[in-house]
């Protein structure tokens, strides 16, 4: 995203994308804002920890504000040494604010005023379970690798490979980025059982929708199975407070690749 780059890639013609709503609302205000903003802040903290370790090891001069700034091509060290530095900077255990301050050579107050306060209206409260910097780093780097692999899968028309990458992406969103919910996980699992090639949550998580890559000839069966297993069985049994109504088209719809925004000159 820095800078933003785009590239046109075609979906295989024999697959469709099914969008299924989990029926869990994902608010973007008040307490939920802490969770939404926590992840990018933890990513910036991970970048700062890596940069600090690089400066100690090789006098790395470049400014680092985000994980994308930790460009291996700019680091004058062998790949294995870079891996060791990152492993040293990002320990598996969650970090407290005091531990982060010590590693970065900063005061806790300084971190609260800067990294934990990305805007005048928001300050992240130190999470009770600690800052999960290694897990967030692993997710972001893994997603970047999956994007590159997805590009190659689309170029070769390999829908099955694309589906496997979607599955891996959801697992990372769940386990490392921590933005899934039991309902999203269930909907993804049931989507796979119903015939999708790959399924994942979409958007910022904590509710909302899932996307499923479905063979075109399987769309009708997929929709019937997911309607029955998730909307008519799982939700009434586990979350009866989430009303779905009686119309599958209100919570599931089929889509596919189409031409994007463009300019049409109507004057000859």
Show where each model-derived region lies.
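C-terminal nucleotide
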Residues: 1-198, 212-268
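Conserved phosphate/anionic-ligand binding catalytic regions in large, soluble enzymes, centered on
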Residues: 199-209
């Amino acid at each position: 995203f820095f800078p933003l780059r785009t590239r046109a890639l075609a979906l295989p013609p024999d697959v469709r994308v099914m969008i299924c709503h989990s029926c869990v609302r994902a608010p973007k205000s008040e307490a939920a804002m802490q969770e939404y903003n926590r992840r990018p802040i933890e990513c910036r903290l991970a970048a700062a920890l890596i940069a600090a370790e690089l400066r100690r090891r090789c006098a790395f001069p470049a400014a680092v504000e985000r994980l994308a700034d930790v460009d291996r091509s700019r680091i004058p060290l062998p790949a294995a040494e870079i891996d060791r530095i990152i492993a040293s900077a990002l320990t598996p255990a969650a970090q407290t604010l005091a531990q982060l301050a010590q590693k970065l050579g900063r005061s806790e107050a300084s971190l609260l005023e800067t990294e934990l306060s990305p805007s005048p209206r928001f300050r992240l409260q130190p999470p009770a379970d600690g800052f999960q910097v290694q897990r967030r780093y692993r997710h972001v780097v893994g997603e970047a690798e999956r994007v590159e692999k997805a590009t190659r899968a689309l170029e070769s028309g390999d829908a099955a490979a694309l589906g496997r990458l979607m599955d891996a992406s959801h697992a990372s969103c769940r386990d490392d980025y921590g933005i899934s919910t039991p309902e999203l996980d269930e909907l993804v699992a049931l989507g796979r059982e119903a015939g999708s090639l790959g399924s994942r949550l979409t958007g910022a998580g904590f509710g909302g929708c899932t996307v499923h890559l479905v063979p075109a000839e399987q769309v009708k069966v997929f929709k019937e199975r997911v309607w029955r297993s998730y909307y008519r069985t799982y939700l009434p049994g586990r979350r009866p407070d989430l009303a779905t109504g009686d119309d599958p088209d209100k919570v599931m719809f089929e889509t596919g690749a189409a031409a994007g925004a463009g300019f049409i000159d109507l004057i000859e």
